[in-house]
Design a protein with these regions (language model features):
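Tandem repeat scaffolds
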Residues: 1-157
Length: 157
C-alpha cells in the first residue's frame, strides 16, 4: 500500500475520490469532508496519534469504506449516517455518541470500543461483542438488535 507520512490535511474536501491501501503515519487530518468517495483497505489509526484532541473528519456523505481499520481512533459524536462500512474494524475506538443510523455495517467488527450513547437504530449487519464493548445508553432497533446475542451461545427460536 501507499504510506502517507508526516502530512497535514486541514479542512480539505475529498470529492469523487478512490483511495486504496493507504496507511497514515504521523499525519494529521482535521475537519476533512469525504464526499461521494470509495476507501478500500485503509488504515486510519495513524492519523491523529492517541490524543483525540480533534476530529479528523468534518463530514462523510455517500462514501463506501471496505476493509478499513479505524482502530485506536477518537471519533466520539461522529455522524456516519449515509456511509457504507463493509468488513471494517473498530478496535479500541472511542465512538461515544456516534451515529450509525441506517448504516450498512456488513461484517464490520467492534471490539473494546466505547459505544456509550451511540445510535445504531436501523443500522444493519453489525458485529458487536457485548463483553468487550461499552454500550450503556446505546440505541438499537429491532430486528438487528438480536445480532448482539450472536456471541452468547444462546438459541433464539
Amino acid at each position: 500500500g501507499t504510506r502517507v507520512q508526516n502530512c497535514r490535511f486541514n479542512a480539505c474536501t475529498f470529492d469523487h475520490c478512490n483511495f486504496s491501501g493507504v496507511v497514515f503515519s504521523f499525519t494529521t487530518m482535521k475537519d476533512a469532508w469525504l464526499l461521494n468517495s470509495a476507501f478500500r483497505s485503509m488504515a486510519w489509526g495513524g492519523l491523529q496519534g492517541k490524543s483525540g484532541v480533534f476530529q479528523p473528519f468534518g463530514k462523510i456523505k455517500n462514501c463506501a469504506f471496505r476493509y478499513n481499520d479505524f482502530s485506536g481512533m477518537a471519533l466520539n459524536g461522529f455522524d456516519w449516517t449515509g456511509a457504507e462500512l463493509q468488513q471494517c474494524t473498530f478496535d479500541d475506538t472511542r465512538l461515544a455518541g456516534a451515529s450509525f443510523y441506517g448504516v450498512r455495517l456488513g461484517g464490520t467488527r467492534f471490539t473494546r470500543c466505547d459505544l456509550q450513547k451511540a445510535d445504531l437504530r436501523t443500522a444493519e449487519e453489525y458485529a458487536i461483542d457485548l463483553e468487550t464493548n461499552k454500550l450503556k445508553g446505546a440505541r438499537f432497533s429491532f430486528p438487528d438488535v438480536v445480532r448482539l446475542l450472536d456471541g452468547t451461545g444462546i438459541v433464539i427460536e
